[in-house]
Amino acid sequence: MRRALFALALLPMLIASLAFAGDAEIKAAQTVIDSQLKAFIANDGAAAYSFAAPNVKQIFPTVDTFMNMVTNGYAPVRKPQSYSFGKVEQTGPGSIVQQVLIVGPDGKDYEAVYTLQQQSDGSFKITGCSLRASTSVST
């Protein structure tokens, strides 16, 4: 009986610690996205490329091929006027899906959805990004 009460008393602390771990992972993932976007804005291709996961680097094996892909296919991500974080979902241990609301270089609104995966060293890397025009109104 005492064990059951002890376990019951620990349950709220365990749940709270899991929530904080999720918050820490989300913050780490957002920091990666923010850092990559800042690198794009600063024209620092090597820094931007460093946030790409191995699966992305396998497809785009050099900084130049990666930057060409981003420049030609993701102009709002490459040169945003502004951006802010939207909805986020932790889809599994070490897996994050993060919405980023972007005002592109053309002044139009876009939604980028990033996927990130925690690596064996504990860091988060960007495994993918989908981009679409948004129907929201920027402020």
Regions found by a protein language model. Give the residues of each.
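Short solvent-exposed beta->alpha transition segments
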Residues: 23-31, 35, 45-94
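Bacterial N-terminal signal peptides
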Residues: 7-17
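Bacterial Sec-dependent signal peptides at the C-terminal "C-region" and cleavage site
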Residues: 16-24
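N-terminal secretory signal peptides that target proteins for export/translocation
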Residues: 1-2
